[in-house]
Amino acid sequence: MTQVVVGQNENIESALRRFKRQVSKAGIFADIKRRRHFETPIEKRKRKAVARRKKRFR
């Protein structure tokens, strides 16, 4: 779970920016979008194959 502790002299905008950065690094939004609809086994295999190809070329 992502947490951000706001300091006394810290404004809420910077804390919100830190929170958004942590959430995007953790991949929470991508996971939510992926789980929004049922993914068939074929779609899952295709997604994983694309991820493997991307990882191999980095």
Swiss-Prot record:
Molecular-function GO terms, alphabetical: structural constituent of ribosome
Chaperone is among the record's keywords: no
Keywords assigned: Ribonucleoprotein, Ribosomal protein
Gene Ontology biological-process annotations: translation
Keyword Flavoprotein appears in the UniProt entry: no
Gene Ontology terms: cellular component: ribonucleoprotein complex; ribosome
Domain of life where this protein originates: Bacteria
Xref: Pfam families: Ribosomal_S21
Matches recorded under InterPro entries: Ribosomal_bS21 (IPR001911), Ribosomal_bS21_CS (IPR018278), Ribosomal_bS21_sf (IPR038380)
HAMAP family: Ribosomal_bS21 (MF_00358)
Family per record: Belongs to the bacterial ribosomal protein bS21 family.
Record-given protein name: Small ribosomal subunit protein bS21
Source organism of the structure: Picosynechococcus sp. (strain ATCC 27264 / PCC 7002 / PR-6)
Gene this chain is encoded by: rpsU
